[in-house]
């Protein structure tokens, strides 16, 4: 996660020029706007690009990755539909990076460089209304992935609408992703109490059918922010439960991930919900989903919305069988 100032003003009009682009005047603004959310010290990426020295050292990798379209990571086709929070470079920006590298990657005048973004690695919500922290958990060495669920202690005496939600991993290198749920049944707490270690293990969800998904974090993602006038209802007395996915590890690690939430203050809020609408069990129309070896089959699923609704986001997801997927919105 990040906190930065000055980047919103870092807009530059590139004109055709004979000289080689420089880091300070041409390249830094592109990198700060599209890359350093992940590529900073302590960020999701494995190397930093926040300084000229960083970028110069990795210049050939940066050129290759941007020319191939591998970076910044953005699987949706920008030519089909423009989506919110796109990480897409223009061809002009790609060419500027390539020309900079081919020209020896000069720094230029450092006084002309844009401000370096400040990454606190803490919170995009500086003053959250609610912070919930999981108990310290010792992640054991394992040859397989671990999906561990934790019930977080919160005080929520009344219904409130979430307008911002972020997950701050306690140990970024080992946290693959985090799902955030609310549970009004108390069943998650029962499962937690039955395990002598902090939390309990469950694959696919938190083991409570009635629980509602309210947030998702993956490396490089920003805080969830709802459209203006809309919010996700957090019910009074609900338990906040997170499922943390840890990959196979060869050493003992410690994690204490937390969730920050900001509530809406408008007198009227339109309710948002995150719901699975197409799956391989309930909505499949020509199941069951069984595929014999060396067989190719096509399946269909259909969902009819029970109410008039607005779709604000879509998130295709697969655990074990999926190799690739396409979604059209």
What is each model feature region?
Residues 1-21:
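Bacterial Sec-dependent N-terminal signal peptides
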Residues 9-10, 29, 58, 80, ...:
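A generic structural signal for solvent-exposed, polar alpha-helical segments
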Residues 6-7, 93, 193, 210:
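Short linear sequence motifs
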Residues 16-152, 239-243:
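Aromatic- and Gly/Pro-enriched helix-to-coil junctions and flexible linker segments
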Residues 73-74, 78-86, 112-310, 315-329:
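Beta-strand-centric surfaces of beta-sandwich/beta-rich domains
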């Amino acid at each position: 996660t990040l906190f930065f100032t000055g980047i919103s003003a870092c807009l530059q009009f590139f004109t055709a020029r004979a000289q080689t682009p420089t880091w300070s005047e041409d390249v830094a603004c592109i990198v700060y706007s599209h890359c350093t959310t992940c590529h900073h010290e302590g960020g999701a990426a494995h190397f930093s690009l926040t300084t000229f020295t960083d970028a110069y050292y990795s210049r050939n990798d940066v050129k290759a990755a941007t020319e191939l379209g591998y970076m910044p990571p953005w699987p949706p086709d920008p030519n089909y539909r423009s989506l919110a929070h796109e990480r897409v470079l223009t061809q002009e920006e790609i060419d500027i990076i390539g020309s900079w590298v081919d020209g020896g990657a000069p720094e230029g005048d450092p006084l002309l460089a844009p401000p370096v973004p400040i990454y606190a690695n803490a919170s995009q919500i500086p003053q959250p209304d609610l912070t919930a922290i999981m108990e310290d958990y010792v992640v054991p060495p394992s040859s397989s992935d671990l999906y561990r669920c934790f019930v977080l202690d919160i005080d929520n005496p009344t219904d409130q609408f979430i307008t911002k939600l972020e997950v701050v991993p306690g140990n970024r290198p080992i946290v693959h992703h985090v799902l955030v749920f609310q549970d009004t049944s108390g069943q998650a707490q029962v499962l937690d109490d039955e395990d002598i270690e902090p939390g309990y293990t469950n694959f696919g969800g938190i083991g409570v059918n009635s629980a509602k998904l309210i947030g998702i974090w993956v490396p490089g993602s920003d805080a969830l922010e709802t459209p203006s006038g809309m919010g996700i209802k957090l019910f009074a007395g609900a338990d906040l439960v997170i499922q943390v996915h840890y990959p196979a590890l060869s050493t003992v690690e410690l994690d204490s991930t937390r969730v920050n939430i900001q509530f809406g203050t408008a007198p009227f809020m339109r309710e948002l919900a995150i719901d699975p609408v197409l799956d391989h069990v309930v909505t499949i129309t020509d199941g069951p989903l069984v595929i014999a070896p060396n067989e190719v089959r096509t399946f269909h699923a259909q969902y009819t919305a029970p109410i008039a609704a607005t779709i604000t986001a879509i998130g295709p997801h697969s655990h074990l069988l999926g190799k690739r997927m396409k979604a059209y919105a």
